């Protein structure tokens, strides 16, 4: 019966979520990132929650503040005022950062570090440089070279011990550097979202896959909204593979169909994720099975050939918030399939975020035409992975 207030109700819930992992599992550290900019109104409840947590946990909590040190090319000088101002704002919220990590394009001098330490009220060895790196994978090595790990351990009163060699990580970086020297393998990422962070995990996954196969991978974005029968050949020219990206809604889907058809008829390996897999299934139904009006219920509720349909348990849901099929679900792979070869095991788990699934009513027709359903959820019998066999090796690889 109480009135919900930002303090204490919202802040208490934020604190509960921050402490959740630490209370539930045996972790040495739990890292929580508060994004945004200090001073923004949206971040105020989170900053207050952090202030309270710091007070409650004492030395068991440590605040690391990331700031940007701009470089004025005209003056040839790094400016620390933005960092000083940011820390002042943080202090006004009741938080004294323990460590400052300064993003910079140029090396920070000892004099500049002392200046920042003095005016931001932190130890000099707690001012850590984070210089621009070629890839994000270089950052842990750079942070270790700056002594960030030792600084954190000392400030939390924990034994320092021997410095880890990070052998596997360094080996990965060395392999990555060698892979970057090879001729690039071009992969077309077909999607509709202009903000490339929407596909960040896909880009990184392809990049890592390239490293482990000793080959540089160049991911070339292709805007599906601008893709037509007239320009698709030029857009996909020289591509070693095509990835049809995930998404929601009908916008940009027509262009995905164009890309899928071109890739299928020109023997270009194609991989569809989520909506991308559904688009591959729809294009196959239209142009191979002969269902010209095949579609997803998401795009056309009245289509008689709803090869992609809303999940049965989703049909009665009216509140769309947080009710999708979310998180990791089990998938059993068909032995001998390309998917089984890729994973090296029969039982896998992959994350999901959708309401629509392959309609099993059409399963026999697909398999008779060469598209095999090789990954099935054992509980719901939902199709998770399809493979199109049209040549000695499977070509279209569509994963839900």
What is each stretch, according to the model?
Residues 1, 320-324, 346-349:
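Conserved N-terminal/central alpha/beta ligand/cofactor-binding core
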Residues 1-215, 225-241, 248-249, 256, ...:
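Flexible phosphate-sensing "switch/lid" loops adjacent to ATP/NTP-binding sites
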Residues 128, 218-222, 374:
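General small-molecule cofactor/ligand-binding pocket signal
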Residues 235-330, 336-338, 400:
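Cysteine-nucleophile active-site neighborhood
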Residues 335-388:
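Catalytic beta-strand/loop cores that center a nucleophilic Ser/Cys/Thr
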Residues 389-394:
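Conserved small/polar residues in nucleotide/adenosyl-binding loops
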């Amino acid at each position: 019966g109480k009135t919900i207030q930002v303090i204490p109700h919202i802040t208490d819930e934020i604190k509960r979520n921050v402490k959740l992992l630490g209370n539930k599992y045996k972790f040495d550290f739990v890292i929580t990132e508060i994004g945004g900019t200090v001073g923004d109104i949206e971040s105020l409840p989170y900053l207050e929650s952090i202030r309270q947590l710091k007070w409650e946990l004492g030395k068991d909590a440590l605040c690391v503040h990331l700031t940007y040190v701009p470089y004025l090319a005209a003056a040839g000088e790094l400016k620390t005022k933005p960092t000083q101002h940011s820390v002042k704002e943080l202090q006004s919220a009741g938080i004294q950062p323990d460590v400052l990590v300064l993003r910079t394009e140029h090396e920070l001098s000892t004099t500049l570090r002392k200046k920042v330490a003095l005016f931001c009220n932190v130890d000099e060895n707690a001012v850590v440089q984070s210089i621009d790196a070629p890839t994000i994978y270089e950052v842990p090595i750079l942070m270790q070279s700056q002594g960030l790990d030792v600084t954190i351990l000392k400030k939390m009163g924990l034994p320092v011990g021997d410095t880890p060699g990070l052998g596997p990580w360094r080996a990965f970086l060395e392999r990555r550097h060698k892979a970057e020297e090879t001729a690039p393998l071009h992969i077309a990422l077909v999607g509709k979202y202009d903000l490339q962070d929407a596909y960040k995990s896909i880009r990184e996954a392809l990049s890592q896959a390239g490293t482990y196969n000793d080959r540089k991978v160049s991911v070339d974005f292709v805007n599906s909204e601008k893709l037509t029968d007239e320009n698709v050949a030029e857009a996909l020219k020289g591509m070693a593979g095509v990835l049809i990206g995930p998404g929601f809604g009908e916008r940009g889907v027509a262009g995905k169909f164009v890309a899928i058809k071109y890739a299928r008829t020109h023997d270009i390996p194609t991989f569809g994720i989520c909506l991308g897999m559904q688009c591959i299934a729809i294009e196959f139904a239209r142009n191979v099975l002969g269902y010209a009006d095949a579609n997803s219920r998401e795009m056309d509720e009245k289509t008689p050939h709803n090869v992609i349909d809303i999940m049965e348990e989703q049909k009665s849901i009216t509140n769309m918030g947080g009710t999708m099929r979310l998180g990791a679900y089990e998938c059993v792979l068909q032995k001998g399939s390309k998917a089984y070869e890729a994973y090296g095991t029969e039982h896998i788990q992959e994350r999901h975020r959708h309401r629509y699934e392959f309609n099993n009513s059409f399963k026999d027709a697909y398999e008779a035409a060469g598209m095999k359903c090789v990954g099935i959820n054992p509980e719901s019998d939902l199709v998770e992975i399809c493979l199109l066999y049209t040549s000695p090796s499977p070509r279209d690889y569509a994963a839900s």
